[in-house]
């Protein structure tokens, strides 16, 4: 493990006992204590580069104050424009930020765009209320008022997920501060239930990254290996990639669970990133609070089992980095300048690649996804329904195998980063996934398959495993 990875791991692990300390604290101590810890971590890991996050926060807050009814689009333009400046610092002869600064900036961008959207929703709701002449009851997810500058700073620097996620909305943060009976919210058991696979994933990461180092792909000797060996190598590279993020995101979720952050009654049917989808009245006593069943779906960032065993490329995106996927769906996909599912996905993947960075490998990887989505959608709608139940089961296994190979292939661009290294590796295996996807798309079109946006998702398999075997 690199020194940076050790630093991330230490930050994630210390957030767990800190969470237990904050869990039963009052709203004021939670707000300012969590912000102080987060700011301290930022200053320690980023040093003077912390200024970038402060400038981004102040700029967004100014836009919210100036144009509250249209601040969402303005905040999106501002934060994404600042990302370009932030990544071009070395080209401008300015000090290059640390990797930790980049991580803070990425999560901060998501939070500030979401905050601006929540403020805009509040103002639009107030306008409708004034126009109608009567007051409605509390609306699900709506903010009570516009956050002040200090409240915006406290949300932005809250230590929870400050470098690794999960992403959370200001409404989720506010609900944590105002939990009526935090002592009744379970933490220890959910934490242990969530944490148990992490040590195994960590060992698998260390073993796979040692046996199949990524650096080998950059060496000339690698390309003297036979084709089957070159094809196989992307499988353990993606395996190590998954194990690394599984450990990081499980640890990050455990930090949230320790603090009771993102806990809602099961009846609220919370979604990762978005929070509750149904209104649930707060409990009126500690006894009633203790009698409720809670979950932490709001801050769930990874479904490891479904990521590995879902059938389709489309579903693989849903279970990976789940809170960020919600953000992309809510703020990018829905406003995409197209109606087609594949074109909307291409737009979303383009901006997702930009959010990750300027390395060509990100764009090569992310922009392969829409081709795979179009191919699997057309071919599946053309052929799967014509098969017997046994044939459909066999289809799903083959589809799953190809889905995993597609992600193996795309992962190589994500980790190799450079244009030359990515294309060199893909060329060494003859761009097999690109050609396979094009062939599947052509066959699906020839057989009259419909576009993915017109297919009924309910009739399609999402996982090879029975529901009862899926990850809790």
Curated annotation (Swiss-Prot):
The chain crosses the membrane at residues 6-22, 34-57, 74-93, 195-212, 232-261, 427-447. It is linked to Intellectual developmental disorder, autosomal recessive 57: A disorder characterized by significantly below average general intellectual functioning associated with impairments in adaptive behavior and manifested during the developmental period. MRT57 patients have moderate to severe intellectual disability, and delayed psychomotor development with poor or absent speech. Some patients manifest seizures and autistic features. Residues 453-472 are annotated as: Disordered. This is Membrane-bound acylglycerophosphatidylinositol O-acyltransferase MBOAT7. It comes from Homo sapiens (Human). GO terms for cellular component: endoplasmic reticulum; endoplasmic reticulum membrane; membrane; mitochondria-associated endoplasmic reticulum membrane contact site. Acyltransferase which catalyzes the transfer of an acyl group from an acyl-CoA to a lysophosphatidylinositol (1-acylglycerophosphatidylinositol or LPI) leading to the production of a phosphatidylinositol (1,2-diacyl-sn-glycero-3-phosphoinositol or PI) and participates in the reacylation step of the phospholipid remodeling pathway also known as the Lands cycle. Prefers arachidonoyl-CoA as the acyl donor, thus contributing to the regulation of free levels arachidonic acid in cell. It is an enzyme of class 2 (transferase). Activity is inhibited by thimerosal. The gene is MBOAT7. It is a multi-pass membrane protein. It comes from the Eukaryota. Residues 23-33, 94-194, 262-426 are lumenal. Overexpressed in metastatic breast and bladder carcinomas relative to normal breast epithelium and urothelium. Keywords: Acyltransferase, Disease variant, Endoplasmic reticulum, Glycoprotein, Intellectual disability, Lipid biosynthesis, Lipid metabolism, Membrane, Phospholipid biosynthesis, Phospholipid metabolism, Transferase, Transmembrane, Transmembrane helix. It catalyses: a 1-acyl-sn-glycero-3-phospho-(1D-myo-inositol) + (5Z,8Z,11Z,14Z)-eicosatetraenoyl-CoA = a 1-acyl-2-(5Z,8Z,11Z,14Z-eicosatetraenoyl)-sn-glycero-3-phospho-(1D-myo-inositol) + CoA; (5Z,8Z,11Z,14Z)-eicosatetraenoyl-CoA + 1-hexadecanoyl-sn-glycero-3-phosphocholine = 1-hexadecanoyl-2-(5Z,8Z,11Z,14Z-eicosatetraenoyl)-sn-glycero-3-phosphocholine + CoA; a 1-acyl-sn-glycero-3-phospho-(1D-myo-inositol) + an acyl-CoA = a 1,2-diacyl-sn-glycero-3-phospho-(1D-myo-inositol) + CoA; 1-octadecanoyl-sn-glycero-3-phospho-(1D-myo-inositol) + (5Z,8Z,11Z,14Z)-eicosatetraenoyl-CoA = 1-octadecanoyl-2-(5Z,8Z,11Z,14Z-eicosatetraenoyl)-sn-glycero-3-phospho-(1D-myo-inositol) + CoA.
């Amino acid at each position: 493990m690199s020194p940076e990875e050790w630093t991330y791991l230490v930050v994630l692990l210390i957030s767990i006992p800190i969470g237990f300390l904050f869990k039963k604290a009052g709203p004021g101590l939670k707000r300012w204590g969590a912000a102080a810890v987060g700011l301290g971590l930022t200053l320690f890991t980023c040093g003077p580069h912390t200024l970038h996050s402060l400038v981004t926060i102040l700029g967004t807050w100014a836009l919210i104050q100036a144009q509250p009814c249209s601040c969402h689009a303005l905040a999106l333009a501002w934060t994404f424009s600042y990302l370009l400046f932030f990544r071009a610092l070395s080209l401008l002869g300015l000090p290059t930020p640390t990797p930790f600064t980049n991580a803070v900036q990425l999560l901060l961008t998501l939070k500030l765009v979401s905050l601006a959207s929540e403020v805009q929703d509040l103002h639009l709701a107030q306008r409708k209320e004034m126009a109608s002449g009567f007051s409605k009851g509390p609306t699900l997810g709506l903010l009570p008022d516009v956050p002040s500058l200090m409240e915006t700073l406290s949300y932005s620097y809250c230590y929870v997920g400050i470098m690794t996620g999960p992403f959370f909305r200001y409404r989720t943060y506010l609900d944590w501060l105002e939990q009526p009976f935090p002592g009744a919210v379970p933490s220890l058991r959910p934490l242990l239930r969530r944490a148990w696979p992490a040590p195994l994933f960590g060992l698998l990461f260390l073993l796979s990254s040692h046996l199949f180092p990524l650096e080998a792909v950059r060496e000339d000797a690698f390309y003297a290996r036979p084709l089957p060996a070159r094809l196989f190598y992307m499988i353990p590279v993606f395996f190590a990639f998954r194990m690394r993020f599984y450990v990081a995101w499980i640890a990050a979720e455990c930090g949230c669970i320790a603090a009771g952050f993102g806990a809602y009654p099961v009846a609220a049917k919370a979604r990762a990133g978005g929070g509750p989808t149904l209104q649930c009245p707060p409990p009126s006593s500690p006894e009633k609070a203790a009698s409720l069943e809670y979950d932490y779906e709001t801050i769930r960032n990874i479904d490891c089992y479904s990521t590995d065993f879902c059938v389709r490329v489309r579903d693989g995106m849903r279970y990976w980095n789940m809170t960020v996927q919600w953000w992309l769906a809510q703020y990018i996909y829905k406003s995409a300048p197209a109606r087609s599912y594949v074109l909307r996905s291409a737009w979303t993947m383009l901006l997702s690649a930009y959010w990750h960075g300027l390395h060509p490998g990100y764009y090569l990887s992310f922009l392969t996804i829409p081709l795979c989505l179009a191919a699997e959608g057309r071919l599946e709608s053309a052929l799967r329904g014509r098969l017997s139940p046994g044939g459909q089961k066999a289809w799903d296994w083959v589809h799953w195998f190809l889905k995993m190979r597609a992600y193996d292939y795309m992962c190589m661009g994500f980790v190799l980063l450079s244009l030359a290294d990515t294309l060199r590796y893909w060329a060494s295996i003859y761009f097999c996934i690109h050609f396979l996807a094009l062939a599947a798309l052509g066959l699906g079109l020839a057989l009259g398959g419909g576009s993915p946006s017109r297919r009924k998702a309910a009739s399609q398999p999402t996982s090879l495993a029975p529901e009862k075997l899926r990850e809790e």
